[in-house]
């Protein structure tokens, strides 16, 4: 039987909030991303290099160029048999096209073999070896390895090392490739970690993606697991697939190559778990649907998906465990209609098994289970303060409005009691938001109170006019009482017009302007009173001290007049003039410092003037000494 204030449908909301424990993929290629990547690669050919990026990049994604025959003709017509790079692009592109065979001469073969030398760059060696492999020509792998190792010792860049890994994947398994394989561990040590989520080279996305593709291709070739931790693989994956739009063909090609390597190799296949469909279900369809794919959003239908446990976030109690998902088409489904979940948040631990290559295969899903709230036992009461009169109680049923009005004044209080229950299980609920709003029908004033439950989860709101007059500004009148109930786990938040309440405050407490009060009128201007200035001494005092300071100068002039001033040794040499002008300028600078400049500005100017004055004075005194010596 449905409770009052409820509907008969129980709704669940399942929302993936976050993975809070193990490191899981945050970026991968959705089906839309894969199509966008294909569109980035499917461009008109402008050169043999662009043809290589388009053809081989699309091939990595399991696609082909629209016109294979036309592409093959373009490769043959643009091939330069005397250029190693051109031969590399042609050989690799023709391999990715069905029925596109390119024949080369012995001279071209000799050119490629000659390029496999320690005098060539690592890139040239890589292109030559890959071209020979693409054309199906024999190669002395051990000699090529020696040339590659010698050259790599001279080129220690990340890109050169990645190209060395790519080269080694074309060499014979009989060759001793351990020295090249060991470079993988060194490259991993050079990766930069960002926020514990991303891992990449400072050289950028393209180099990082090529490293991933080259590493797994080489490891598949030699049959050894790469020295990369599972968490590092996920961090590399997050960095590579965080970018969705590509500036160049080469960048799109590198991402496609990395995606192909991570989706199919012998050691590490990251698992992507994504919820499917609408987050809301009826009780008859309480089914969690998950898409389990690789990084290219290709379904892993051969996998086995199990729920390890489902725990309540609030109580940490386990409510469901060791339950298998069922594969329906490409989607894994978990039917938990028979389990009575109370509303709230749950942590679902899901594990994907069936292949020992799977990594990031344990996923924590935050699941929100929502329900509908029912309001029961709603009582409205007026309680006499002196308790001389028995309380008057009226029961009202949601969503009806109580008939008549209720009065709260200096003689009696108004009280509201109610309970909140889960309409599906009948369990008591305590939503996060339970408010009582009182709206003045005349002035529009609103006052909101929080309704709190007691120990028995019975909500109570009591209005005592003597205690609440400040909230209401002592504004008497008829108020509409609303009950507001909300929570993230509720499917039916409630705004209920419960009753009309007449609130009367004592006349002495009512402000004369309460109804005409306008809170948006300009406030009274603030007149700031500054501190009274300190009393200064009389002018005669300051003048007296000024005269005392100037008295030595007056004495100097008096003595000059009496005994005479000897200026016979003064010359008009540049050093003499500059010295006296510099000295005067420094005295003037002191005045400017006093009136305008700060200490640091003054020191800067003083350093310039002082240097010039010092040099000029030194020159002037030297000339005076020479003059005395001559006489």
From Swiss-Prot:
InterPro entries: Ribophorin_II_2nd, Ribophorin_II_3rd, Ribophorin_II_C, Ribophorin_II_N, Swp1. Residues 562-571, 618-631 are cytoplasmic. It is found in: Endoplasmic reticulum; Endoplasmic reticulum membrane. Pathway: Protein modification; protein glycosylation. The keyword Transmembrane applies. GO terms for cellular component: oligosaccharyltransferase complex. Residues 23-540, 593-596 are lumenal. There is a cross-link at residue 154 (Glycyl lysine isopeptide (Lys-Gly) (interchain with G-Cter in ubiquitin)). Keywords: Endoplasmic reticulum, Glycoprotein, Isopeptide bond, Membrane, Signal, Transmembrane, Transmembrane helix, Ubl conjugation. It is a multi-pass membrane protein. Its main location: endoplasmic reticulum. Glycans are attached at residue 106. It comes from the Eukaryota. Residues 1-22 form the signal peptide. The chain crosses the membrane at residues 541-561, 572-592, 597-617. One of its GO terms (biological process) is protein N-linked glycosylation. Belongs to the SWP1 family. Component of the oligosaccharyltransferase (OST) complex. OST exists in two different complex forms which contain common core subunits RPN1, RPN2, OST48, OST4, DAD1 and TMEM258, either STT3A or STT3B as catalytic subunits, and form-specific accessory subunits. STT3A complex assembly occurs through the formation of 3 subcomplexes. Subcomplex 1 contains RPN1 and TMEM258, subcomplex 2 contains the STT3A-specific subunits STT3A, DC2/OSTC, and KCP2 as well as the core subunit OST4, and subcomplex 3 contains RPN2, DAD1, and OST48. Subunit of the oligosaccharyl transferase (OST) complex that catalyzes the initial transfer of a defined glycan (Glc(3)Man(9)GlcNAc(2) in eukaryotes) from the lipid carrier dolichol-pyrophosphate to an asparagine residue within an Asn-X-Ser/Thr consensus motif in nascent polypeptide chains, the first step in protein N-glycosylation. N-glycosylation occurs cotranslationally and the complex associates with the Sec61 complex at the channel-forming translocon complex that mediates protein translocation across the endoplasmic reticulum (ER). All subunits are required for a maximal enzyme activity. This is Dolichyl-diphosphooligosaccharide--protein glycosyltransferase subunit 2. It comes from Bos taurus (Bovine). The gene is RPN2.
């Amino acid at each position: 039987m449905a409770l009052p204030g409820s509907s008969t449908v129980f709704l669940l909301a399942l929302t993936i909030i976050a993975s809070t424990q193990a490191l899981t993929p945050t970026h991968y290629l959705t089906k839309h991303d894969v199509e966008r990547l294909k569109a980035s690669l499917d461009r008109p050919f402008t050169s043999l290099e662009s043809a290589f990026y388009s053809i081989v990049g699309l091939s990595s994604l399991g696609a082909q160029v629209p016109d294979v025959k036309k592409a093959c003709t373009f490769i043959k017509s643009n091939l330069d048999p005397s250029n190693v790079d051109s031969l590399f692009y042609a050989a690799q592109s023709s391999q990715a096209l069905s029925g596109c065979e390119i024949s080369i001469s012995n001279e071209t073969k000799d050119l490629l073999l000659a390029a496999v030398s320690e005098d060539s760059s690592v890139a040239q060696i890589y292109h030559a070896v890959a071209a020979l492999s693409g054309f199906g020509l024999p190669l002395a792998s051990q000699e090529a390895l020696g040339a590659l190792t010698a050259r790599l010792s001279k080129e220690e860049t990340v890109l050169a090392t990645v190209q060395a890994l790519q080269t080694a994947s074309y060499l014979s398994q009989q060759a001793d490739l351990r020295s090249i394989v060991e470079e993988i561990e060194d490259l991993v040590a050079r990766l930069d970690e960002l926020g514990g989520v991303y891992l990449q080279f400072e050289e950028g996305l393209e180099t990082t993606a090529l490293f991933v593709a080259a590493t797994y291709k080489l490891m598949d070739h030699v049959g050894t697991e790469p020295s990369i931790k599972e968490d590092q693989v996920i961090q590399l994956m997050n960095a590579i697939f965080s970018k969705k739009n590509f500036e160049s063909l080469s960048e799109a090609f590198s991402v496609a190559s990395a995606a192909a390597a991570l989706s199919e190799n012998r050691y590490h296949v990251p698992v992507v778990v994504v919820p499917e469909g609408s987050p809301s279900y009826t009780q008859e369809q309480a089914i969690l649907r998950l898409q389990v794919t690789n990084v290219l959003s290709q379904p892993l239908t051969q996998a086995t998906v199990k729920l390890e446990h489902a725990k309540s976030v609030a109580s940490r109690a386990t409510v469901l465990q060791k339950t298998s998902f069922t594969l329906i088409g490409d989607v894994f489904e978990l039917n938990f209609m028979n389990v009575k979940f109370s509303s709230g948040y749950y942590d679902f631990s899901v594990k994907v098994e069936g292949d020992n290559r799977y990594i990031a295969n344990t996923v924590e899903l935050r699941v929100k289970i929502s329900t509908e709230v029912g309001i029961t036992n709603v009582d409205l009461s007026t309680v006499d303060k002196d308790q001389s009169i028995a309380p008057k109680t009226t029961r009202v049923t949601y969503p009806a409005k109580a008939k008549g009005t209720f009065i709260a004044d200096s003689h009696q209080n108004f009280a509201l009691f109610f309970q909140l229950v889960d309409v599906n299980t009948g369990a008591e609920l305590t939503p996060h938001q339970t408010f009582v709003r009182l709206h003045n029908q005349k002035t529009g004033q609103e006052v909101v109170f929080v309704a709190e439950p007691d120990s028995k989860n019975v909500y109570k709101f009591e209005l005592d006019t003597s205690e609440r007059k400040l909230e209401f500004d002592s504004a008497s009148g008829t108020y509409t009482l609303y009950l507001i109930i909300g929570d993230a786990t509720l499917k039916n938040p409630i705004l209920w017009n419960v009753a009309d309440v007449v609130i009367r405050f004592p006349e002495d407490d009512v402000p004369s302007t309460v109804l005409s009060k306008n809170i948006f009128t300009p406030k009274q201007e603030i007149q700031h009173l500054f501190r009274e200035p300190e009393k200064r001494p009389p002018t005669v005092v300051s003048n007296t001290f000024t005269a005392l300071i100037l008295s030595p100068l007056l004495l100097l002039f008096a003595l000059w007049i009496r005994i005479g001033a000897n200026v016979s040794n003064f010359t008009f040499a540049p050093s003499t003039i500059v010295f006296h002008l510099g000295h005067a300028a420094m005295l003037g600078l002191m005045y400017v410092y006093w009136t305008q400049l700060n200490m640091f500005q003054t020191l800067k100017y003083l350093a310039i003037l002082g240097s010039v004055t010092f040099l000029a004075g030194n020159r002037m005194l030297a000339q005076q000494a020479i003059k005395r010596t001559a006489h």
